[in-house]
């Protein structure tokens, strides 16, 4: 099932080509906040793996690292980089629960996937 949640007053980015009506209330998974800008936070179980973010550095499981989605044109793609050119703001959490999130946001997003706190993922 696909649900769409809208926060603030977004403009059309054409990243999603199918019309999906906005859902009311809060998602069933994680917590969204707009108090100090946008943020999404969820707990991660010990065996949860996190996949996605397109061509981001590191291995296929993105857990345990910090990623910045900022579309920076930097040719030196090494393990210590937190941001590459393309922004693929889609993640899948696989483990006790299987759920995916797409963040249609044209600005900078920070994906802290168990980096600051090993059992917490925060997107802000």
Model-based region annotation:
Residues 1-124:
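Catalytic and substrate-binding clefts that recognize carbohydrates or anionic sugar/phosphate headgroups
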